[in-house]
Amino acid sequence: MEKYQAYLELLRRSRYQDILYPLFFRESIYGLAYGHESFFIENIDYNNKFSLLIVKRLSTRMYQQTNFILFANDSNKKTFGGYNYNFDSQIILEGFGVVVEILFSLQLFISSLRGLESVKSYKNLQSIHSIFPFFEDKLIYLNHKSDIRIPYPIHLEILVQXXXXXXXXXSFFHLIRFFFYYYSNGNSLFPPKKGISTFFSKRNLRIFLFLYNLYVWEYESIFLFLRNKSSQLQLKHFRVFFERIFFYEKIKHLVEISTKNCSYTLFFFKDTFIHYVRYQGKSILVLKNTPLLINKWKYYFIYLWQCYFDIWAGPETIYINQLSQYSFHFLGYFLSIPQNLSVVRSQMLKNSFLIKIVIXXXXXXXXXXXXXXXXXXXXXXXXXXXXXXXXXXXXXXXXXXLDRFLRICRNFSHYYNGSAKKKSFYQIKYILRFSCIKTLARKHKSTVRTFLKKLSSEKLLEEFFTEEDLFSLIFPRTSLTLRRFSRGRIWYLDILFRNDFVNHLEFKIGSDTF
């Protein structure tokens, strides 16, 4: 943290444009990249091979221009002159990521000094935990939904150019372009027959995550400009990601914008019932208006990707549905808005009336097939959604195996406790319980019935099932007691941290959807 502050102070006081270039050759930059105290991003694939001595030798060779060019030209070879260049390339890429993060941290710092702090404008930026209450409170009043799959750039150069306007150091920018140009010829970065989307799904290098997030933020900043129909962005945090003076030139392919009279040109965007949610490479646009407006937004997104980012995105990238007729997948849930018809008797003087009221409520159901596949991937159930004994957990201690199944069951309960229909929810918990019993019985080399008699099954029941689960097993489904419990919907604040297989759920469902 102190190192970051020191570099920020150095950049703030410096008047040279090429201050980022010498930072790239400092060993302490790579110490920040591979240290565990970075507050920018979680360190990925860290191991003890990245020592300061290796980085120092690498930076010494990089000072020599001939060796650096040879290193780039021979990036497809495992070794050259006794050095592992693929390994060195990974080190250099992490260094690029830290230097670029320092650059944008400096711009955020300068913006805060000028009174452009973005704390007040965070009222429209909410965490993932507020999405589920949003569905219950506001989604029922909207009628159209658009599923958007954010396309990947076809070439890494598009991502690099996104940082060109913000990078003041021309030498550093050309160095990044030079390195990517030669490094892309190697087999270790871009597979010849695979696209950049496959590359991003398998690689989590710091610099590529930053460039991709920069691309998404710039695309969303243009979307927010169109949404807010204003000549000045309301979310000041986006101002650091592109130059304002080039904005109207970039946007001219989408709509005709007049800088003097912008409100009349973008008057048709005025709609208070529009909401945008982005998660895991996809986004949802929901609004309450005619189908014409949401179809306009569909083609605005397509033209934006084609004209601004040179990304071909066909109409099949965006799906438009009515919320009252279709359900959609979101973070492992099936969400729908059914309309319930209720009859209210009203009496005025001697006359009585029957009034029919349509009540729309958000119904969130657990995806049983995807949840069973996620439990099978975690070796907690069989592929046919049946209880199975985990061979890996059988070799561990009995307390460790029980804790593992309890943790999975608890995470599953916390994540799906807000669902309206909990039949699938109870089925998965039933599978997890008996998978744990089978695993422990296999460890003790006995049958399930013998193991239950020996260990007392009531204790396992208390561990695996809450009071609500026990009522669902004891009372009939039509019981008033069960219906009283089933109406209770609780959203936990730590759902994304407690659920270990939410990413697998979304990948499984998303692969079928798009």
Swiss-Prot record:
Pfam families: Intron_maturas2 (PF01348), MatK_N (PF01824). It is found in: Plastid, Chloroplast. GO terms for cellular component: chloroplast. GO terms for molecular function: RNA binding. Disulfide bonds: none annotated. Its main location: plastid. One of its GO terms (biological process) is mRNA processing. Keywords: Chloroplast, mRNA processing, Plastid, RNA-binding, tRNA processing. The keyword RNA-binding applies. InterPro entries: Domain_X (IPR024937), Maturase_MatK (IPR002866), Maturase_MatK_N (IPR024942). It comes from the Eukaryota. Usually encoded in the trnK tRNA gene intron. Probably assists in splicing its own and other chloroplast group II introns. Belongs to the intron maturase 2 family. MatK subfamily. This is Maturase K. It comes from Phaseolus coccineus (Scarlet runner bean).
